Amino acid sequence: MQEIESLHQSVLLQEVLQAFMPLEEGVLIDCTLGLGGHSKALLSQKPHLKLIGIDKDKFAQEIAKERLKAFEGRYNLLSGGFAKRFKEALETHNKEIKGVLVDLGVSSLQLDDDNRGFNFHSHTLDMRMDLESELNAQKVINSYPIVALEKIFRDYGEIKEYKKIAHKIAERRAKKPFKNAKDLSEFLSSFSKNKKIHPATLVFQAVRIEVNSELEELKEFLQCARNLKGAILCVISFHSLEDALVKNAFKDYAKNCICDPSSFKCACSNNHALGEILTKKPITPSPEEIKNNRRSRSAKMRVFQFKP
C-alpha cells in the first residue's frame, strides 16, 4: 500500500480540493474513483462529507477500498459504468448530492501494467477498463473492417493519415494478426514518422476510446448531469475530444435563452440557466506538477455550479 501511495499521483489534487471547498456535508460522487486519491483527500478535508465512488475496474476499486479504510461508514463503492451508476445515484440521492467529480484519465497503475495493454510495451492487446467486457483492443485491431478502423482513427484519434494507417494494419493482420501492444506499437513506428509524439499514441487513444465507449459514456453522463440541483460538478479531461464535450455541455447548462437561434426576439423568459460556469478558462496543472508527474500535462479541469 505504501508503494501505491508513492506511485499514484492524483492529477490537479489541490485544484480539486479548492473547487469543492464550499462543501461541508452531503454526498460527493466520485464517478471515476480509480485508486481513490481525490476521494481520500476530500474525505480527509471534509469530515461530514459522504462518498459514492464508482469505477469499472474492480481491481482498482479493491485498492481504493483499502486506501479509504479510515473512512469506514462514510463511503459506498459501486462497480460499473459511471453514466449508468450516476443516473441511479441521482434518482435516489438527488437532494443530498453536493458535489460530483469526474477524472477521465487512465490511472498510472493501469498504464504501467503490462498485462492490461494500455502502454506500448504491453504483453497483451486488451485496453479494457472493465475486464468482464467482451470487446478488447485485439478484436478491434484484428477484426474490425477497414471502414470501421478508418472511422475510429479519424473520429477518436483525430489522425490525418487515418486511411493509410487502417489499410496498413489490414494488410499486416491478413498475413499475421497482431498479438500484443508491443507488436502493434513497433509496427506503427516502422512507417509513421511523427516527430512530435510517438507514432502509436493517437492510434492507442482511438482504440481505447472505442473499447471502453468513453465518449458515448461521457455524453450520456453530461446529459444526465443536467438534473443536478445545487451541486458543484468538476470534470478533468485529457484530450480535446473530451474537453470539447465538457466545454459545450457547460455552455449549454449556462444558457438563459433557449429560443431558436433564428428567432428575432426572445420568447422564453430568458431565465433558463441551470447555474454558472466557475472556470472561464480550464484549469491546467502547474509547471511544478507537470515536472513531478509528466502524465498530468494534458489535463484540463472545468467546474460548474448548479442552482439549488
UniProtKB/Swiss-Prot annotation:
Chain segments annotated as coiled-coil in the UniProt record: none
Record-annotated membrane-spanning stretches: none
Binding site for S-adenosyl-L-methionine: G36, G37, H38, D55, F82, D103, Q110
Natural source organism: Helicobacter pylori (strain ATCC 700392 / 26695)
Protein name: Ribosomal RNA small subunit methyltransferase H
PANTHER family: 12S RRNA N4-METHYLCYTIDINE METHYLTRANSFERASE, S-ADENOSYL-METHYLTRANSFERASE MRAW
Stated family: Belongs to the methyltransferase superfamily. RsmH family.
Entry keywords, A to Z: Cytoplasm, Methyltransferase, rRNA processing, S-adenosyl-L-methionine, Transferase
Protein EC: 2.1.1.199
A Gene Ontology biological process term: rRNA base methylation
Molecular functions per Gene Ontology: rRNA (cytosine-N4-)-methyltransferase activity
